[in-house]
Amino acid sequence: MEHNNIYRSVFKVTHSGGSGSCFYLKNYDLFVTNYHVVEGYRTVAVHDNDRNPYLAKVVLVNPALDIALLAAEGDFSALPEMTLAADDSLTIGRKVYVAGYPYGMPFTITEGSVSSPKQLMDGKYYIQTDAAVNPGNSGGPILNDAEEVVGVTVSKFTQADNMGFGIRVETLHAPVSY
């Protein structure tokens, strides 16, 4: 896995209320994050790994799915493509990677396995992984070995170790096709 492509395409989201993560989808010229990361804000800043800030408008939100799309000012054409996995091919035990900015710190990638590809919580299905997930990772991608986005990091159980969750990729296909 070539981590440099991930490193270049995952950004930090900041606003006066905190921070999270997002990732760039070149085919759509949009950044994807969680709704709860940008809730209450119409504009935010996205920062690359050189800490360059770019103003981004929140252009689409779906609170029920916890997805938000951001349009940032700037030329991102040189960034590598991060593709959405064509379908949900995750199985228990498959290796996944969680990329983002935990606690607002510099970029990290953690590795883990799929604990459950379809964990039902609150009437929705999520990816459950044992990869390290912390506040600030929200909105960042969950990737497979082929560097395809298989999910969007959303939360962890604070009272348990190694229980991170992500929005499944098929949930993401509809909003970005909008």
Task: Explain the meaning of each model-derived region.
Residues 7-8, 15-20, 26-100, 104-108, ...:
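Conserved active-site neighborhood of the chymotrypsin/trypsin-like protease fold
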Residues 17, 60-62, 115-118, 146, ...:
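A generic structural motif
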Residues 116-128, 176-178:
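Short peripheral tails and domain-boundary helices/loops at the edges of structured domains
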Residues 80, 127-134:
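Short pre-catalytic strand/loop immediately N-terminal to key active-site residues, enriched for Gly-Thr
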